[in-house]
Amino acid sequence: MFFEEAVSSGPQFFNLVPWIVFFPVLGLLFNIFLGGRILERGEAGEKIVGGVASLAAGLSFVVAVLQAVSLIGHPEGEVVVLAEWIRIGELNLQWAFQVDTLSVTMMLVVSGVGTLIHIYAIGYMHEDVRHNGDPGRFRRFFVFMNLFIAAMMILVSGDNYMMLFVGWEGVGLCSYLLIGFWYEKGKDGIGNALAAKKAMVTNRIGDFGFLLAAFTIFWTFGTFEFHAIFEKAPEVAVANPGALDGAGG
């Protein structure tokens, strides 16, 4: 009994969840504005640039762990509202994060694996630092990686379909940038560039299906927010049995 009460009254860190996005964004901003000068220090500069990017991803993982700890005592989770985002007529969208078992699981996977990739890339990208006399490539790679982590975090934690779409677009952009990163390396570079373009076109096809489904759901439920849709789903199913089939495709 004492253990159950202790768990149920455990610490809550839900209010920290926006930092899963803020930390990677801070990391990429640091390297955008300061990374060029830091790389002038040579190999030591590489370690700083890569280390800052890795630290940003690692701190995002720490926040994800804290969300998992919070769920132990509060399994119902929470929706954390950061700010009002879009208000058009009856449409009122907030920039909010959904903290539940599924989203936290994905946060842990994305930030955990992403941090390991960042650390590995510090050494892996060493030979690419001075490629074609462009030392900025090393910095750009880690900027793209931090941006990818931030976009993925929005994708897996957003509380509405429009935030999900923003994350989806960000991940698509980063995929294009990273797949085609070595676009100038001879025949291999041509293959990289073509693969990047193919990924971009494929994602744009996905955009059409995504938006079609999202606006069909909005037409059916009158909202883009996940928790509101889940609450209304049983009522809509009873009132119009065919509505959910149409909304779900």
Where are these regions (language model features)?
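...captures the hydrophobic TM-helix bundle architecture rather than a specific catalytic motif
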Residues: 1-249
